[in-house]
């Protein structure tokens, strides 16, 4: 039987493999951007390169923006969903054993039309800027540069927290798919992820520990 996964609305069957497939073009663009980063880093200073140093540096900037933004957006689809069909009966089809089919022609790019995917992408983007500035502070002995980086860390940390907390709060109060243990019926459960934290305190402790350690590392370096 066909079942369709739609963002926050219809019942669906999802697993990690189809979640990755649900954002196909996002993952492909992410992969391409990091390949572009590696090539640009290697060739920007080589003598006689055809594109010139500034072109490769521009590619590095593109990767620095596109990579974290889309990576966060793709991960967000694990919580917001993607538009595809699943037909598990195809697993027995030796000619075409593909169980996932797109619900539209965007092949995952439609994930960027969901504001919450973009919000987590922005959180990852600003966190990447924080980590980059922290690296400069801890690796380069230049007072003028480190002072600028400290200001950058503070500014980007504020933006990171705004977007990250917005996504976390929205996720905790959102409905999620659950299974009735008596009837095995799949239904939408209010506050699903918040309930998951309550029922699995170890996961909550790990999550909070990670957040606290990130903020501690930022504070220890900057203050």
What are these regions (language model features)?
Residues 15-34:
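Extracellular loop-to-transmembrane helix junctions
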Residues 29-45:
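Central hydrophobic cores of alpha-helical transmembrane segments in multi-pass inner-membrane proteins
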């Amino acid at each position: 039987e066909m079942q369709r996964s739609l963002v926050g609305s219809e019942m669906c069957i999802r697993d990690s493999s189809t979640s990755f497939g649900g954002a196909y073009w996002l993952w492909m663009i992410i992969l391409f951007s990091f390949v572009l980063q590696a090539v640009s880093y290697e060739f920007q200073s080589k003598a006689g390169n055809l594109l010139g140093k500034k072109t490769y540096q521009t590619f590095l900037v593109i990767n620095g923006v596109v990579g974290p933004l889309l990576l966060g957006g793709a991960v967000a689809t694990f919580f917001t969903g993607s538009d595809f069909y699943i037909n598990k009966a195809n697993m027995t089809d030796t000619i075409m054993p593909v169980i996932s089919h797109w619900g539209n022609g965007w092949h995952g790019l439609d994930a960027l039309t969901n504001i919450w995917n973009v919000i987590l992408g922005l959180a990852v983007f600003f966190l990447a800027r924080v980590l980059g500035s922290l690296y400069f502070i801890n690796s380069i002995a230049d007072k003028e540069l480190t002072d600028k980086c400290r200001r950058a860390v503070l500014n980007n940390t504020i933006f990171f927290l705004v977007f990250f907390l917005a996504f976390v709060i929205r996720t905790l109060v959102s409905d999620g798919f659950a299974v009735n243990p008596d009837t095995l019926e799949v239904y939408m459960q209010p506050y699903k992820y918040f309930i998951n934290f309550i029922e699995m305190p170890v996961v909550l402790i790990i999550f909070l520990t990670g957040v606290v350690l990130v903020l501690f590392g930022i504070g220890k370096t900057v203050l």
